[in-house]
């Protein structure tokens, strides 16, 4: 894969892209603003991932030496310039859609830069930032489809799922984070307590998920599909309690990403 594509972490950026498309499907809104919005959040997420890799250069030499910057595929300064250009493009796209969307993109851009520079290494605050940014993609889509309330509801579920997964990723990266004197949740409070918080968040998500059917937001199709996602989240929680090794956390993180994608599919199918 081209390193300039790889550094965007296209899989993660694609999830943001899908979030906006989901709001279009749910709201039965199909116009050029949706296309621009999906592209906007993809680029914004990719630029956030790039600036994050720029500031994480030293940590990634330990945790992820094959990433574009530590592997030497992209020079450090070029990564910075690349991210700033992408940020600018995403902001322009946001304002083309609407003033409100443009403001959201600017706020998210500021948050992503502050997160990468400082907040990521602060206990739990960094996790909250990533989860908030993920949730805001649905709000962003809701602004386009004129259904902000639903955007906030789905954004809340995305927030819970992302927050749990971010804690798992911190446990996976604990070795490199310790060497860089980061103050992540598992470093400050221990791996077991961090796992328990991730598990609790997973359980809360599973318990609340049927409410979207109960309150007639989505159809029975949603309930059938979300059960699959819930099973994956429960299984991930079980694995996390059993084994906190780097390899296990990496596997659990992947399982949870699959669970999130299935949950997103349930949103779309439940609205048809």
UniProtKB/Swiss-Prot annotation:
The keyword Transmembrane helix applies. It comes from the Archaea. CDD domains: PT_UbiA_DGGGPS. Its EC number is 2.5.1.42. The lineage of its organism: Archaea, Methanobacteriati, Methanobacteriota, Methanomada group, Methanobacteria. The chain crosses the membrane at residues 16-36, 79-99, 100-120, 124-144, 148-168, 194-214, 217-237, 252-272. It is an enzyme of class 2 (transferase). It is found in: Cell membrane. Its main location: membrane. Belongs to the UbiA prenyltransferase family. DGGGP synthase subfamily. It is a multi-pass membrane protein. GO terms for cellular component: plasma membrane. One of its GO terms (molecular function) is magnesium ion binding. It comes from Methanosphaera stadtmanae (strain ATCC 43021 / DSM 3091 / JCM 11832 / MCB-3). Keywords: Cell membrane, Lipid biosynthesis, Lipid metabolism, Magnesium, Membrane, Phospholipid biosynthesis, Phospholipid metabolism, Transferase, Transmembrane, Transmembrane helix. One of its GO terms (biological process) is glycerophospholipid biosynthetic process. Its cofactor is Mg(2+). Prenyltransferase that catalyzes the transfer of the geranylgeranyl moiety of geranylgeranyl diphosphate (GGPP) to the C2 hydroxyl of (S)-3-O-geranylgeranylglyceryl phosphate (GGGP). This reaction is the second ether-bond-formation step in the biosynthesis of archaeal membrane lipids. It holds the Pfam family UbiA. This is Digeranylgeranylglyceryl phosphate synthase. Pathway: Membrane lipid metabolism; glycerophospholipid metabolism. It catalyses: sn-3-O-(geranylgeranyl)glycerol 1-phosphate + (2E,6E,10E)-geranylgeranyl diphosphate = 2,3-bis-O-(geranylgeranyl)-sn-glycerol 1-phosphate + diphosphate.
């Amino acid at each position: 894969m081209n390193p300039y594509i790889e550094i965007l972490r296209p899989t993660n950026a694609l999830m943001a892209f899908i979030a906006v498309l989901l709001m279009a499907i749910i709201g039965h809104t199909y116009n050029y603003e949706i296309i621009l919005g999906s592209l906007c959040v993809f680029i914004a997420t990719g630029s956030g991932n790039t600036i994050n890799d720029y500031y994480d250069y030293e940590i990634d030499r330990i945790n992820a030496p094959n990433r574009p910057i530590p592997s030497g595929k992209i020079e450090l300064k070029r990564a910075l310039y690349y991210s700033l250009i992408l940020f600018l493009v995403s902001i322009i796209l946001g304002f083309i859609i609407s003033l409100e969307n443009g403001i959201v993109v600017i706020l998210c851009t500021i948050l992503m830069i502050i997160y990468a520079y400082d907040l990521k290494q602060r206990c739990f605050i960094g996790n909250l930032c990533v989860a908030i940014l993920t949730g805001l993609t649905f709000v962003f889509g809701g602004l386009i489809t004129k259904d902000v309330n639903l955007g906030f509801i789905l954004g809340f579920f995305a927030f819970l799922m992302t927050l749990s997964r971010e804690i798992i990723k911190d446990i996976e990266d604990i070795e490199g984070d310790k060497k860089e004197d980061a103050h992540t949740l598992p470093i400050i409070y221990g791996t077991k307590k961090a796992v328990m918080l991730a598990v609790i968040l997973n359980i809360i998500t599973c318990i609340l998920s049927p409410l979207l059917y109960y309150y007639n937001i989505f159809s029975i199709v949603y309930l059938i599909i979300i059960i699959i996602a819930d099973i994956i989240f429960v299984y991930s929680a079980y694995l996390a309690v059993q084994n906190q090794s780097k390899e296990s956390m990496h596997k659990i993180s992947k399982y949870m990403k699959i669970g999130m994608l299935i949950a997103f599919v349930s949103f779309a199918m439940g609205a048809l």
